A protein has these predicted regions:
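A polyanion-binding, active-site-adjacent surface
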Residues: 1-188
């Protein structure tokens, strides 16, 4: 029998696959509806997420919630939110390749358990690691990509933290969200 959510939570809680376990306060597995049809994947926990053990709880999380609400979704209601990394990189630096390699199997297991109908990758780090590309986020926007053996549709948009720094790109993110919503509607 394949391990389920409880086994995954326990494995992440005791994980020592990379050095980030030494500096984290709490690992951040994910949050939301475990029968969700939408999976939102970000980069890594920040300081507030590390303290609370939940992804997207700071200002970027508030913006993500507003973005989801704009397309008729809500955290915890048909939405599950996770990150590439389950532990916070010091100083919120980009994840190192070895850290991603250590953590990605956990996300892949989450995806197996969830079996989402659509994945929304927010930010360059999530997009590049889920799609195995070094392309820019701008080049990958506006297309339906496929993830994994189940060929789950994957849409790319900007990370909410980036949008807080560059609000002029919110219009592009809105276009991405409307595109994701229309792709999802066609899956029904």
């Amino acid at each position: 029998v394949a391990p389920g959510w409880q086994e995954l939570e326990e494995a992440v809680a005791r994980c020592t696959r990379c050095e980030l376990y030494r500096t984290r306060t709490r690992p951040v597995l994910g949050v939301g509806d475990r029968h969700a049809q939408w999976l939102i994947v970000g980069e890594a926990p920040g300081a507030e997420e590390d303290r609370r053990g939940e992804p997207f709880v700071g200002a970027a999380g508030q913006l993500l919630d507003a973005m989801l609400q704009a397309i008729g979704l809500a955290r915890g209601r048909n939405v599950y939110i996770a990150n590439i990394l389950k532990s916070r990189p010091p100083g919120n630096r980009d994840p190192a390749p070895a850290e991603v390699a250590a953590c990605l199997p956990y996300l892949e297991r989450q995806i197996e358990l969830l079996r989402p109908r659509l994945i929304l990758a927010v930010g360059r780090i999530a997009m590049q690691n889920l799609l195995g590309t070094d392309s820019s986020l701008g080049r990958m926007r506006g297309q339906v990509h496929e993830f994994g053996g189940l060929k789950t549709p994957l849409i790319v948009t900007y990370h909410p933290a980036y949008l807080l720094r560059k609000p002029e790109d919110k219009r592009k993110a809105w276009e991405d969200l409307k595109f994701a919503r229309s792709v999802f509607a066609r899956l029904a």
